[in-house]
Each structure stands twice: as C-alpha cells, then as structure tokens.
Amino acid sequence: MEDSDTSAILAEDSESVDSRTVCRCFRVTENKAPPPCSCPLSVTVEPVMFLSTFSIVLQAPLCTQYLWDRLSEDVGYNGTKTGGCNASTVHDPLQTEVETLTAHWSLYINLGGFLVGLFMVILLGSWSDRAGRRLVLIIPSLGLAVQAAVYLTVMYLKLPVFWFLIGRICSGLSGDFNAILAGCFAYVADTSERGSRTFRVAILEACLGLAGMFASIIGGQWRRAQGYINPFWLVLATNLTAALYAYLFVPETVTPDPQARLFSTRHHQAVCRLYSSDAPPGRRSKLWLYILCFFLVVTVHLGCSDLYVLYELSAPLCWGPELIGYGSAAKHLAYLTSLTGLRAMQCCLEDSWVALVGLTSNMVGLVVISVADTTALMFTGYGLCFLFMASTPVLRSKLSKLVDPAEQGALFASVACVEGLCSLVSSGVFNALYPATLHFMKGFPFVFGAAILLIPAGIIGGLGCQEKRESRENREGFGIS
C-alpha cells in the first residue's frame, strides 16, 4: 500500500471520528435550558459525586457500629465498653453471636436495597439518554435523604433495627447511590475525548476517595464525641445539598425528550442490544470479558469493605470509633494515591498494565490485612493497597470506548446494574463467609478476595496482549512502522 493511500485512509478515519465528535458536541449543547445558576469553576458533576460519597461513607461505618451496639444490648454483651475486648476474649460466645447477628443484618439490609434498586438503576440510567442526566443525579440524592431521615427516626425512637431495611428500600426505589454513579460517569463520557477519558474517569473516582477520607476522619471523631444522631443530620443535609447543586448548577448534556417514559421496556432492550451486537467483530466478547473483570474487582472491594469495621471492632484489634475512622480514611486515601499513580504510569505503560499493577497492590494489601493482629500491621495492609483503585477507571474507560457515543447511557446503566449485583453478591458471600470461618481463620475472607482477583488479572493481561498484537498487525497492514 502506498504512503499516500495510507495517509488518505488515516485522514478519512480521523475526519469521520472528528465529525462524529462534533455531532455529539452539538447534540449535547444545543436546545437545552441552562441551569438556574452558573458555577464559576470549571466543574460539573464532581461536587455531586463528592457530596453523595461523603454521605455514604459517613453513614456506612456508623450504621455498622450502631447495629453492633443495639444488638450487643439485645444479647447482653458489653465487652468493648468494659475493656473486655482483648486477646483472651477471642472465643467469647457472646462476642461471636454479636458478630454473626451484625453480619447477617448487614446482609439483609444490603439485599433489600439491591432487590429494589436493581431494575430502577437500569431504568434511570437508560432513561437519562432521552430525559437528561440531571434528573438521574437529583432523584437518587433525594432518595438517600429519605433513607437518612428514616435512620434518624430509628435512632430517636429506638425502633427495631428492621426499620433500617425500610430506609434502605426507600433509597433503592430512587436508584440508590449506584444511579448517581451511572449518571456521573455517563456525564463524563458525554463531555470527554477518548484519549483523556481514562484520566477523567480517574478524577471522578478520586472524588470518591477524597470525600471518603474526610467523612471517615470526621465520622469516627464525631461519633465518639456526640454519638450517632448528629452525624446523621449531616448525612441528611449533604444529600439535600447534592440534589440542590445538581438542579442549580449542572448543565444538561442531553436534549430532554418530552415523550421519554421512565417505565418502558425500551430501556432494557437497549441494554440487551448493547451486549448482543458484535459490530465491529470482537466487540461483544471484549465487552463481556471486561464486565466480568469489573464485576469481580468491585465484588471483592465491596465485600472486604463491608467487613473492615467488624474485623477492627473485635479482638484482637478492638478498635474504637477514632481508630476506625482513621482506618477508613487510610483506605480512602488510596483513591488519591491511585489517581497519582495512574497518571504517572500512563507515561510509560498502557492502560491494561496499569490495571494489573493496581490489582497486584490490592492483592498484597488484602493478604497482609488477613493476618493483621496489631494496629501497625493493619495500617501496613491499608498502605500496601495504595494503588488498588487504579484498575476500575481503566475498566470503565475501556468499556466506554467499546460503544458508540449514543450508547453511553445504556452502557453505564448496565455497569451500575452490575455494581448493584456486586453489592448483593459481596454481601451474600463475604458476610456469610466471615462468621462461618471465624473458628479457624478470622481473616480468611480477605485471602479469598485476593485469590479471586487473580481471575481479572489474567483476563486483563490476556486482552492487553491481544489488543497490542491487533494494533501491531493493523500498523503493518497499513505499512506503518
């Protein structure tokens, strides 16, 4: 093939991509009413992500600790309050009973939220392709505010912990936090170029870590000083603020269609077409494999996160609220270190190998945490996980690049659905595995999680080699050295 022909082909491809990008830009910027207010800073959905994550991370360990305290009162256990939590009480039957009850109630609450929110996430995410992204940010924020209000009612009136499940279901009816994730990542896909998408996604995920770090530090100290109620008032206010910000400041990227209906089978059909179409050839298999990797990585992350507080509360660590807050802050600090590491590694490594480094960091950290019997060793495990979030931005970006611009909403709706499934599976597996393995190895679930991560590592490595080989063959076919 002549060099002139090669140049013409590449120019034509570039022109078609540019024209498609231009069309996309016009589609998302014209004929839409601007928000009531304009933000002077060059940010869009980042504050929504930050505020929603702040509320979730602030309430999650407090809910677990509240369940622990309420269930301890029910069975008459007061080991952590009287200083009885030490190495000699590892086999205390009351402590084991409280751990088991707390793990099971966490399972029931997460299961209830998942079953209700599963289909709502798909509906809301795909619906946003026609109705607009802002609604998918506002509705779940209001649902999370209702959940916080129910939790406050339980604490004020000392209602049975069953009412926590009711609050979780209320949040699930609005799409829960996963709908906010879907809306935010679809928004970034609308407004970013292919070359910069991985880093833009990583910035959005860094908002998760920054908010989580602040919430963890504040939550532990605040709960120790004033109990549970005041922090949950902040959770309520934060969710309302997120909804208000999305309404006032976030520009719309999709022209709203007045005919768009939320409850329609077309949303599920769009997702089915996305995963059944094999044009271009090979796309479908890559899409399924990357979704499988994403499912396994997020399942391990959520499953282990659910157990950290239980693991730290009981012997031999016996952490109080302050140390639990610092531990959660250290875990969320890894979001920021992962962002920095990802940016640095992109200078010399392809995205697939960046993801492998992140998975390796995660596996090593989990193994150390599984044998942690001192505070120093536990924080060492957290420190070794400093790149553990480098893999998920790569996976989201690769999935986004496999589909057309008009399919981004359906894609991230399905990804959000997978995240909901991850929440269910992680709760079912890890919260059941933890009490079942207490008698022979307390940290076994973390070793199990590290072993599971070997699967996505192998898949990502294999696909990375295949993509590199295909890229080399394409260059040779065009006569490009």
Swiss-Prot record:
Q: Where in the cell is it found?
A: Cell membrane; Apical cell membrane; Basolateral cell membrane; Endosome membrane
Query: What is the name of this protein?
Result: Proton-coupled folate transporter
Extracellular topological segments? 65-102, 156-160, 224-228, 310-322, 372-375, 435-442
Q: Which Gene3D superfamilies match?
A: MFS general substrate transporter like domains
What is catalyzed by this enzyme?
Answer: folate(in) + H(+)(in) = folate(out) + H(+)(out); (6S)-5-methyl-5,6,7,8-tetrahydrofolate(in) + H(+)(in) = (6S)-5-methyl-5,6,7,8-tetrahydrofolate(out) + H(+)(out); methotrexate(in) + H(+)(in) = methotrexate(out) + H(+)(out); pemetrexed(in) + H(+)(in) = pemetrexed(out) + H(+)(out)
State what this protein does. Proton-coupled folate symporter that mediates folate absorption using an H(+) gradient as a driving force. Involved in the intestinal absorption of folates at the brush-border membrane of the proximal jejunum, and the transport from blood to cerebrospinal fluid across the choroid plexus. Functions at acidic pH via alternate outward- and inward-open conformation states. Protonation of residues in the outward open state primes the protein for transport.
Segments on the Cytoplasmic side according to the record's topology features: 1-45, 129-132, 175-197, 248-286, 346-351, 397-408, 462-481
| Gene Ontology BP, a term | transmembrane transport
Record note on quaternary structure: Monomer.
Its Gene Ontology cellular component terms are: apical plasma membrane; basolateral plasma membrane; endosome; endosome membrane; plasma membrane
The SS bond pairs are C85-C318
Q: What is the lineage of its organism?
A: Eukaryota, Metazoa, Chordata, Craniata, Vertebrata
Q: What is the primary gene name for this protein?
A: slc46a1
Q: Name the UniProt key words of this record, in alphabetical order.
A: Cell membrane, Cytoplasm, Disulfide bond, Endosome, Folate-binding, Glycoprotein, Membrane, Symport, Transmembrane, Transmembrane helix, Transport
Organism annotation: Danio rerio (Zebrafish)
InterPro entries given in the database record: MFS (IPR011701), MFS_trans_sf (IPR036259)
